[in-house]
Amino acid sequence: MIDIGLSKMALIGAVALIVIGPEKLPRVARTVGTLLGKAQRYVADVKAEVNRSMELDELKKMKDTVESAAREVHDSIQTSASAFEKDWAEAIDSAAPLPGSTATVPAPEYKHPGKRWRLKRSALPQWYKARSGVRSKALSGAARVARYRPGKSR
């Protein structure tokens, strides 16, 4: 901030000792130190704010360039899509129907395959379910402990 050498600091200290006196000098030095600290923090805050505003300006410029590029891409896609639609309409209009195909064939109807997955799943043999670990009933932890506790007669 301010460039003061060691000799200048000693001269300022000697003048302050003579003018203020040895009793009040520590309190004045603390006050001056506090004020200098506040001034340095204020300058740092101002610098940070200026940097932030400069970055915002740069980001706004970048945003504008990206938006203009996106607008150009959108316009080019729009023009090519309209040209394609125009060509497609011309191709459809110019395509003449064949002489023998005056009758239109209806599109085939969708027929559900009818696989019935759940029925097939339940139709598995019981021995296969037992070996592959398919559970038909779920047990809670407490019920499992009560059922499989060793050494207790029922």
Curated annotation (Swiss-Prot):
GO terms for cellular component: TAT protein transport complex. One of its GO terms (molecular function) is protein transmembrane transporter activity. The keyword Protein transport applies. It is found in: Cell inner membrane. The chain crosses the membrane at residues 1-21. Pfam families: TatA_B_E. InterPro entries: TatA/B/E, TatB. One of its GO terms (biological process) is protein transport by the Tat complex. It is a single-pass membrane protein. Keywords: Cell inner membrane, Cell membrane, Membrane, Protein transport, Translocation, Transmembrane, Transmembrane helix, Transport. Part of the twin-arginine translocation (Tat) system that transports large folded proteins containing a characteristic twin-arginine motif in their signal peptide across membranes. Together with TatC, TatB is part of a receptor directly interacting with Tat signal peptides. TatB may form an oligomeric binding site that transiently accommodates folded Tat precursor proteins before their translocation. Belongs to the TatB family. The Tat system comprises two distinct complexes: a TatABC complex, containing multiple copies of TatA, TatB and TatC subunits, and a separate TatA complex, containing only TatA subunits. Substrates initially bind to the TatABC complex, which probably triggers association of the separate TatA complex to form the active translocon. This is Sec-independent protein translocase protein TatB. It comes from Verminephrobacter eiseniae (strain EF01-2).
